[in-house]
């Protein structure tokens, strides 16, 4: 008899081929959790503009790592390894992969889950730390699918919002860092550089996103498990657009450390569990070049966990614990910890209020975007007036 238990692994997704880059970017920037705008109707046109203008540069970046993202292949390896690990602890389960912005899409995974008549489902994001722009975006999509489909509502599901503090995950990260440190000429002199994917600062300060808090706690846990004397720093990478993101920024800290005389860096991709463009290209190529030009002599990067045995065992334990615990629902997890209005704003607000200030910021962003479009296109009201 086929198993009626399923595990749905959630991830971002990535383009498999150069021709997939533009539609992937369009899907990414169409998500209001990625770029928040005051009016829904602006989302698709802006996504089209950004994906079209960025496609060529992004394709060049992907060309540096073979033309496409390895994320799907690695996630499939993780799913197979997790299925075997679950069988090893007596749990028969079907594994499904749901990517947010590229194939196999979350909707495709849900269709297969229904076809397989799954009755118990663990939803496990492959993001150790929760953010409204990663796990939160996928959870909101799933919640919408559940609300629209009576068949899905028959499934007993549970969410694992984050697992940055799971002992097995922490131990696996410490193990990989230890191995990389020991490859350095002078291991104790290396600075351990944790680089996390950034998010706009407003996600944390306005929307109550726990991401920064969980990242910082995760670093403390890993350093305690590592138990080495090395200095360490935390910075944030992959900033996009004109708004302020979490700081300090990775490239700035690299330059600061080099100016202080640091010669050896061991970079840890703290928010990534699989190799993809932000580890293979952004860290391994861009940041390595910045470090070398600044005088860093040894630049080593800790590999992503991928299908590391300890990591897969930790995922299996997470699933086991989730099946035994009371279920966690979308309504529970998607509720912001702060009482502020999340996207989309339902009405305009005037005055010196936090809501009015958010509108001011959004209008400023729209003005900036309009200026960028005019600068790129060479057409618009400022050109007509002779101001550009």
Curated annotation (Swiss-Prot):
Q: Which InterPro entries match?
A: Ferrochelatase, Ferrochelatase_AS, Ferrochelatase_C, Ferrochelatase_N
UniProt KW Metal-binding keyword? yes
UniProt-listed Pfam families: Ferrochelatase
Instruction: Say yes or no: keyword Iron present.
Output: yes
Reactions mediated catalytically: heme b + 2 H(+) = protoporphyrin IX + Fe(2+)
Protein family according to the UniProt entry: Belongs to the ferrochelatase family.
What role does this protein play? Answer: Catalyzes the ferrous insertion into protoporphyrin IX.
What's the protein here called?
Ferrochelatase
Q: Which organism is it from?
A: Thermosynechococcus vestitus (strain NIES-2133 / IAM M-273 / BP-1)
Q: Which gene encodes it?
A: hemH
């Amino acid at each position: 008899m086929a198993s009626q238990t399923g595990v749905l692994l959630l991830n971002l997704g990535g383009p498999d081929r150069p021709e997939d880059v533009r539609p992937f970017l369009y899907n990414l920037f169409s998500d209001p959790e990625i770029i928040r705008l005051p009016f829904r109707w602006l989302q698709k046109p802006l996504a089209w503009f950004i994906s079209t203008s960025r496609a060529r540069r992004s394709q060049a970046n992907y060309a540096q790592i073979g033309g496409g993202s390895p994320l799907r292949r690695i996630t499939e390896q993780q799913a197979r390894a997790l299925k075997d690990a679950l069988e090893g602890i007596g749990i028969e389960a079907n594994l499904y992969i749901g990517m947010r912005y590229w194939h196999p899409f979350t909707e495709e995974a849900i269709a297969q889950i229904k076809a397989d008549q799954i009755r118990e489902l663990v939803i496990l994001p492959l993001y150790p730390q929760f953010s409204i722009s990663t796990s939160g975006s996928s959870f909101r999509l799933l919640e919408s699918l559940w609300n629209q489909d009576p068949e899905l509502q028959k499934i007993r599901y549970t969410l694992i919002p984050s697992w940055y503090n799971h002992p097995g995950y922490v131990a696996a990260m410490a193990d990989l860092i230890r191995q990389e440190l020991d490859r350095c000429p002078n291991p104790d002199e290396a600075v351990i550089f944790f680089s996390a994917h950034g998010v706009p600062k407003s996600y944390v300060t306005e929307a109550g996103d726990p991401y920064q808090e969980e990242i910082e706690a995760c670093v403390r846990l890993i350093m305690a498990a590592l138990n080495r004397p090395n200095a360490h720093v935390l910075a944030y990478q992959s900033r996009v657009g004109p708004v302020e993101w979490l700081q300090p920024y990775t490239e700035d800290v690299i330059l600061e450390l080099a100016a202080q005389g640091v010669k050896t860096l061991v970079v840890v991709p703290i928010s990534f569990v699989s190799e993809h463009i932000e580890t293979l290209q952004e860290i391994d190529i861009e940041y390595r070049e910045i470090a070398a030009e600044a005088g860093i002599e040894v630049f080593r990067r800790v590999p992503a966990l991928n299908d590391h045995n300890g990591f897969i065992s930790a995922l299996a334990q997470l699933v086991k614990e989730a099946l035994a615990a009371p279920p966690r629902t979308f309504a529970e997890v998607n509720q912001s910890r702060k009482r502020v209005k999340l996207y989309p704003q339902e009405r305009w607000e005037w005055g010196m209020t936090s809501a009015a200030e958010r509108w001011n910021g959004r209008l400023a962003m729209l003005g900036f975007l309009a200026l960028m479009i005019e600068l790129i296109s060479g057409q618009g009201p400022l050109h007509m007036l002779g101001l550009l």
